[in-house]
């Protein structure tokens, strides 16, 4: 179970970082 939970947490963190980076690039391009 801990492995699945840690994997899910890692996936969620990666998704958050990717979306944040994408939004940052979009804002930079917008400006």
UniProtKB/Swiss-Prot annotation:
Entry keyword set: Chloroplast, Electron transport, Membrane, Photosynthesis, Plastid, Thylakoid, Transmembrane, Transmembrane helix, Transport
Domain of life (superkingdom): Eukaryota
GO MF annotations in UniProt: electron transporter, transferring electrons within cytochrome b6/f complex of photosystem II activity
Listed transmembrane segments: 4-26
Function according to Swiss-Prot or TrEMBL: Component of the cytochrome b6-f complex, which mediates electron transfer between photosystem II (PSII) and photosystem I (PSI), cyclic electron flow around PSI, and state transitions. PetL is important for photoautotrophic growth as well as for electron transfer efficiency and stability of the cytochrome b6-f complex.
Main location (coarse class): plastid
Family affiliation: Belongs to the PetL family.
GO biological process: photosynthesis
Entry membrane topology: Single-pass membrane protein
Pfam families: PetL
InterPro entries recorded: Cyt_b6/f_cplx_su6
Stored PANTHER family: CYTOCHROME B6-F COMPLEX SUBUNIT 6
GO cellular component: chloroplast thylakoid membrane; cytochrome b6f complex
Alphabetized SUPFAM superfamilies for the sequence: PetL subunit of the cytochrome b6f complex
Keyword Thylakoid among record annotations: yes
Complexes and interactors: The 4 large subunits of the cytochrome b6-f complex are cytochrome b6, subunit IV (17 kDa polypeptide, PetD), cytochrome f and the Rieske protein, while the 4 small subunits are PetG, PetL, PetM and PetN. The complex functions as a dimer.
Compartments, record wording: Plastid, Chloroplast thylakoid membrane
Protein name: Cytochrome b6-f complex subunit 6
């Amino acid at each position: 179970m801990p492995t699945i939970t840690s994997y899910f947490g890692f996936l969620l963190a990666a998704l958050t970082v990717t979306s944040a980076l994408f939004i940052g690039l979009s804002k930079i391009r917008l400006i």
